[in-house]
Amino acid sequence: MEILMIFVCGILTAMSVYLILSKSLIRIIIGTTLQTHTANLFLITMGGLKKGEVPIYEKGITSYVDPIPQALILTAIVISFSVTAFFLVLAFRSYKELGTDNVESMKGVLEDDRE
């Protein structure tokens, strides 16, 4: 199962790189969000996709699940949510100001307005 998940992570990484390299600001935001989800999936996969009990000491339980990847992913989800919200607000504001979401046409707009 871990091998299959690694291939899925590779495909998702390729998709996110394709979106990040596009010219639309919304596609770039979707690509970065997809990349963070891919990193979370990779961490879960490397933590082990095995069945086990909660890591609380009880007699008779020999197989525990590692809690560190789960804690890292929970933190990463919160951080990626806040970064995505910031990027969406930034994209909305730049669209309202500049009238486009094309990154290449945004390049010299502010410099041309100053002259």
UniProtKB/Swiss-Prot annotation:
<keyword id="KW-1133">Transmembrane helix</keyword>
<keyword id="KW-0050">Antiport</keyword>
<keyword id="KW-0375">Hydrogen ion transport</keyword>
<dbReference type="InterPro" id="IPR050601">
    <property type="entry name" value="CPA3_antiporter_subunitC"/>
</dbReference>
<keyword id="KW-0472">Membrane</keyword>
<comment type="subunit">
    <text>May form a heterooligomeric complex that consists of seven subunits: mnhA1, mnhB1, mnhC1, mnhD1, mnhE1, mnhF1 and mnhG1.</text>
</comment>
<keyword id="KW-0812">Transmembrane</keyword>
<feature type="transmembrane region" description="Helical">
    <location>
        <begin position="1"/>
        <end position="21"/>
    </location>
</feature>
<dbReference type="GO" id="GO:0015297">
    <property type="term" value="F:antiporter activity"/>
</dbReference>
<dbReference type="GO" id="GO:0005886">
    <property type="term" value="C:plasma membrane"/>
</dbReference>
<protein>
    <recommendedName>
        <fullName>Na(+)/H(+) antiporter subunit C1</fullName>
    </recommendedName>
</protein>
<dbReference type="InterPro" id="IPR039428">
    <property type="entry name" value="NUOK/Mnh_C1-like"/>
</dbReference>
<comment type="similarity">
    <text>Belongs to the CPA3 antiporters (TC 2.A.63) subunit C family.</text>
</comment>
<feature type="transmembrane region" description="Helical">
    <location>
        <begin position="28"/>
        <end position="48"/>
    </location>
</feature>
<dbReference type="GO" id="GO:0006814">
    <property type="term" value="P:sodium ion transport"/>
</dbReference>
<comment type="function">
    <text>Mnh complex is a Na(+)/H(+) antiporter involved in Na(+) excretion.</text>
</comment>
<keyword id="KW-0813">Transport</keyword>
<dbReference type="Pfam" id="PF00420">
    <property type="entry name" value="Oxidored_q2"/>
</dbReference>
<keyword id="KW-0915">Sodium</keyword>
<keyword id="KW-1003">Cell membrane</keyword>
<feature type="transmembrane region" description="Helical">
    <location>
        <begin position="72"/>
        <end position="92"/>
    </location>
</feature>
<keyword id="KW-0406">Ion transport</keyword>
<keyword id="KW-0739">Sodium transport</keyword>
<dbReference type="GO" id="GO:1902600">
    <property type="term" value="P:proton transmembrane transport"/>
</dbReference>
